[in-house]
Amino acid sequence: ENVIEHKLYIVHRLDKDTSGLMLFAKNRITASKISLLFSTNKITKYYIAATNTKFNKNTDTLINYNSDKKQLKLAYRKIQLDNHENCYLIKLFTGKKHQIRLQFYLNKNPIIGDKKFSGNKFNKLLLCSYKIIFKLYGKFYKFKINPNKILS
C-alpha cells in the first residue's frame, strides 16, 4: 500500500485458490458501480483452467445445478497453452461460488490442483481469472493477463 497513492476498493472476489486478474477501484462510487455490474451479470468474465483429462467436445456449454438448486452455466473452448495439454477458455454466464470447479467436477473433468472437488494434491489450483470486459460511464473496458505466466 505504500507504493500506491490511492486507497483501493475491491470490487469482486475470486475463490481462495484461484489466481489471476482482479479489479480494484480508486474511489468508493466507482467501486459500488462496478460491484453492481458484477452482481447483475453485466460483466463478462473469462477464466482459463487446466485439467488432466479432456472433455469429449472441444467446445460446449455446461448447465448444472448446485446444492441450492441454482442453475450454473458456462461455456468452454479447448485452447493451447504452454506446459498443459488440456486447457480451456471458460466464459461464465452465472457467477456462483466455486462454479467452474464444481461444473468441471460434475462433468468428470476436475481442474488440476482442486483439493475441494477432486482430491488432487497438485500444489496449485490451475484456474485463472483471465479476462474481464464491461461498460462503465459510456466506455468499454477490457482487462486481460498472460495465462502462461500464471498457470506455469
Q: Which ranges hold each PLM region?
A:
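RNA pseudouridine synthases
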Residues: E1-S152
